[in-house]
Swiss-Prot record:
Task of the protein: This is one of the proteins that bind and probably mediate the attachment of the 5S RNA into the large ribosomal subunit, where it forms part of the central protuberance.
Gene designation: rplR
Organism per entry: Desulfovibrio desulfuricans (strain ATCC 27774 / DSM 6949 / MB)
Single GO MF annotation: 5S rRNA binding
Stated name of the protein: Large ribosomal subunit protein uL18
GO CC term (a single one): cytosolic large ribosomal subunit
UniProt cross-references to NCBIfam families, sorted A to Z: L18_bact (TIGR00060)
Lineage of origin: Bacteria, Pseudomonadati, Thermodesulfobacteriota, Desulfovibrionia, Desulfovibrionales
Family: Belongs to the universal ribosomal protein uL18 family.
Highest taxon listed in the record's lineage: Bacteria
Length: 119
């Protein structure tokens, strides 16, 4: 039986999570995208704690006209990098959450690199 697009993503996510884990020294940058918004958070898996988080939804309250396109996703990446720098986080492990490294997911990664995070 053929898997749906979301079921296939969930299966990829499980395979990736077996290999990728965040620590206190190098936490995990997780990206989630919906049809309307892009969410990013930095997680320490050993403690089970979210260190910083932001999204186009949160940024849209401050900036009028922020859309969930590649430009908005890049702003999310820049903002998550700024917030991480405030908490003295320089290096992260990128978790694409089962999505293809393309489009909005790639834009978040590029924005985070531009903001100073090291993958």
């Amino acid at each position: 039986m053929k898997y749906s697009k979301n079921e296939s993503r969930q299966r990829r996510k499980i395979r990736i999570s077996k290999k990728v884990s965040g620590t206190a020294e190098r936490p995990r940058l997780v990206v989630y995208r919906s049809n309307l918004h892009v969410y990013a958070q930095i997680v320490n898996d050993l403690d089970g704690a979210t260190l910083v988080a932001t999204s186009t939804l949160a940024l849209g309250k401050n900036e009028s006209g922020l859309h969930c396109n590649k430009g908005g996703a890049e702003k999310v990446g820049i903002e998550i990098a700024r917030m991480a720098k405030e908490k003295n986080i320089d290096k992260v492990v990128f978790d694409r959450n089962g999505y293809l490294y393309h489009g909005r997911v790639k834009a978040v990664a590029d924005g985070a690199r531009e903001g100073g995070l090291e993958f």
